[in-house]
């Protein structure tokens, strides 16, 4: 057998979705920011009064826990942010001034995700946050997701190279309270609505790219999601008798690509 080391450059992020109102006050820096282009700035300018100033000025990257010291530093920063929002540890539990405890459940449909969220749960406990996870069957998971009956779930939002009408279902306020919609976060933001419309009705490719970048920036700065995991490759074990094209496509799903293009060596 051999091992295919290189695969698509397609990003494969999975983001847990918060569904717990008190978490809005955590003010955790959970977004990725990059330089804002001239066209993107011009598109966002009419909404400046409704957006944080950092949207226009800062390049932001998520904190990296590089060893125990890095993790400790991140936890200390999180503790400071929580305290500034009125959350303090009392009797070993994080509470606000009204005595409301910060606790939530992560809903899972795949057993393998337990080992992924467990370190997250353990780190939250160091801040006095009581978090746990529950594994349910796929049917119940889908039902609870459709009806927004969850505190937090693990989910991925697949995107194409030409975003369009589907963005309305993902982010628009019209889909926020619609049962079964893809707006699992429940976003209701007039700026997001306006930018979604810019994407959907973009007159040309350049306008589409600018609108998509602007929407992406605003969504990330909204801190609706916690980046969960990422890998730039597909890990594929295969028999040495199989062969594949020397030039890989930029974007592809592993299984269909293998079925359609691989062959048996002669």
Label for each model-derived stretch:
Residues 90-96, 132-135, 211:
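Surface-exposed patches in mature extracellular/periplasmic domains of secreted proteins
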Residues 100-110, 131-134, 151:
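Short, well-ordered beta-strand elements
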Residues 133-143:
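Short helix-initiation/N-cap motifs at beta->coil->alpha
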Residues 20-27, 114, 118:
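Short, surface-exposed alpha-helical segments at coil->helix boundaries
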Residues 72-105:
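Immediate post-signal peptide segment of exported/extracytoplasmic ligand-binding proteins
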Residues 120-131:
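Short alpha-helix C-terminal cap/hinge motif
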Residues 1-25:
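A glycine-/small-polar-enriched, mobile loop at the entrance of the PLP active site in fold-type I
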Residues 31-62, 75-79, 112-122, 143-266:
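Detector for C-terminal structural segments
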